[in-house]
Amino acid sequence: MKVSIYGAGRVGVSIAFSLLHTSLVDEMVLIDIDKKRAEGEALDLLHSSSMFKSCNIWAGDSKDIEDSDFIVITAGRSQRPGETRLELLGDNVRIMKEISEDIVKYSPNSIIINVTNPVDVLTYFIWQFTNLPSQRVIGTGTTLDTARLRVLLSQQCGISPASIHAYVIGEHGDSEFVPFSNATIGGLKLIDYCKLCENNSEQGFCLNLKIIEEKVRKAAYEIIERKGATNLAIGAVTARLISSMWRNEKRVWTISVLVDGIYIGYPSVIGKSGVEKVLRLNLSEDEEKKFQYSRSVIQKSIEEIKSKIF
């Protein structure tokens, strides 16, 4: 397997390091505007690869992405003092355009995974710029948020996260939400499981769903406040996404996927060739309203970029 990663910052390197642990990667290319940094990170990763399957890792240029199985995008710049959100977004869309042109020129058969935020908006523009099948252009979406949710439920319920089927959907951002009506543990609705749980209250319900949902939504802010950035968990999640596709596991992930004309976090089956099926959830009336609102947030950003930048 060959993986090319645009962006050798903390997120890009965390993804690369997590990929080494899978022992599936034969070649890995790091591409960054700061070539010297990319070379240093590549060398450090190369030395660590001796602990895993042998992997050829180097800092390259756009042409080196040729014949990549997966291209991961973590590139982008941060907000400058006094700069508006739209100005920043416009610049990052332009960066995505340059990368998209590289992909079309050198490796048009790759599966593209975008990680750069706002992930849903930027993944949409990558899809537009490359004109590749949407099945092969995805974003990490709410996969990390879903992982956070399952950890919180696991701690509360005393059940392995692997046995908890609950998802965060919508925008990877403040409008994301949890459709708890679809959440299950061992085939039981989450609410029904709570009646059997040793932690249950007199009312037969041990979870404050609003608090858990808010903790998931605020998790990134909490981490950034303490360490300045989130990188390890998204690194693990992205590497797991790649290994899942490479092994053709056909697992369900809440990736950013094309749904009714825009990219948004939604449960989808992914395999060797990318997205195989988008699973339409049976949402409650309130959940449907939340989903449509989240969708409108993404749509608004897309329309702003189209009208003011291009």
UniProtKB/Swiss-Prot annotation:
Means of activity regulation: Allosterically activated by fructose 1,6-bisphosphate (FBP).
Catalysed conversion reaction: (S)-lactate + NAD(+) = pyruvate + NADH + H(+)
Gene Ontology BP terms: glycolytic process; lactate metabolic process
Family under the similarity heading: Belongs to the LDH/MDH superfamily. LDH family.
Organism: Fervidobacterium nodosum (strain ATCC 35602 / DSM 5306 / Rt17-B1)
Domain of life of the native organism: Bacteria
Binding site for NAD(+): V11, D32, R37, V115, T116, N117, T140
Primary gene name: ldh
Protein name: L-lactate dehydrogenase
Entries under CDD domains matching the protein: LDH_2
Main location: cytoplasm
Active site: H172
Protein's job: Catalyzes the conversion of lactate to pyruvate.
InterPro entries xrefs: L-lactate/malate_DH, L-lactate_DH, L-lactate_DH_AS, Lactate/malate_DH_C, Lactate/malate_DH_N, Lactate_DH/Glyco_Ohase_4_C, NAD(P)-bd_dom_sf
Binding of substrate, residues: Q79, R85, N117, P118, V119, D120, D145, T146, A147, R148, T230
Subunit record text: Homotetramer.
Sequence positions that bind beta-D-fructose 1,6-bisphosphate: R150, H165
Catalytic EC class: oxidoreductase
EC number: 1.1.1.27
Subcellular location per the Swiss-Prot or TrEMBL entry: Cytoplasm
One protein family per Pfam: Ldh_1_N
Biochemical pathway: Fermentation; pyruvate fermentation to lactate; (S)-lactate from pyruvate: step 1/1
Keyword Cell membrane set for record: no
Example GO molecular function: L-lactate dehydrogenase activity
GO cellular component: cytoplasm
Chain positions with Phosphotyrosine modification: Y221
HAMAP family: Lactate_dehydrog
Sorted UniProt keywords: Allosteric enzyme, Cytoplasm, NAD, Oxidoreductase, Phosphoprotein
